[in-house]
């Protein structure tokens, strides 16, 4: 029998996945802004000479703002950088919601990377302390 926390965890997982599918559908099917930005970026990079908006070779460097320059440079980042930026937090939230569906409440949150690293480091320190105490006891007993 599932308790209330587990039921809410499964509802949270379902809603999170539903919202994710809706967001991906909106970005890749509905949003005309994304399509225009993608086409403009392809047209810029397919040209013979790509100019940076902040370069000295551009015709009027003061006419472009730093926001346009930043937006242009961010669009030039490779796909794996964007995938890492968006997938790491997405997976962390998903794993936290999934860990809420576990029967043992002590294991909630162990899937989150910082908590997982803290638990592993704490176990390593505890093991080191225990082995040092055992070696001291052996020295005292002899």
Curated annotation (Swiss-Prot):
It comes from the Eukaryota. InterPro entries: LYSET (IPR028024). It is a multi-pass membrane protein. This is Lysosomal enzyme trafficking factor. The chain crosses the membrane at residues 8-28, 76-96. Disruption phenotype: Knockout leads to severe developmental defects in zebrafish embryos, including heart edema, insufficient cartilage, and skeletal dysplasia. Required for mannose-6-phosphate-dependent trafficking of lysosomal enzymes. LYSET bridges GlcNAc-1-phosphate transferase (GNPTAB), to the membrane-bound transcription factor site-1 protease (MBTPS1), thus allowing proteolytic activation of the GNPTAB. GNPTAB is involved in the regulation of M6P-dependent Golgi-to-lysosome trafficking of lysosomal enzymes. LYSET is thus an essential factor for maturation and delivery of lysosomal hydrolases. It is found in: Golgi apparatus membrane. The lineage of its organism: Eukaryota, Metazoa, Chordata, Craniata, Vertebrata. PANTHER family: LYSOSOMAL ENZYME TRAFFICKING FACTOR (PTHR31925:SF1), TRANSMEMBRANE PROTEIN 251 (PTHR31925). One of its GO terms (biological process) is lysosome organization. Keywords: Golgi apparatus, Membrane, Transmembrane, Transmembrane helix. GO terms for cellular component: Golgi apparatus; Golgi membrane. It holds the Pfam family TMEM251. The keyword Transmembrane helix applies. Belongs to the LYSET family. Its main location: Golgi.
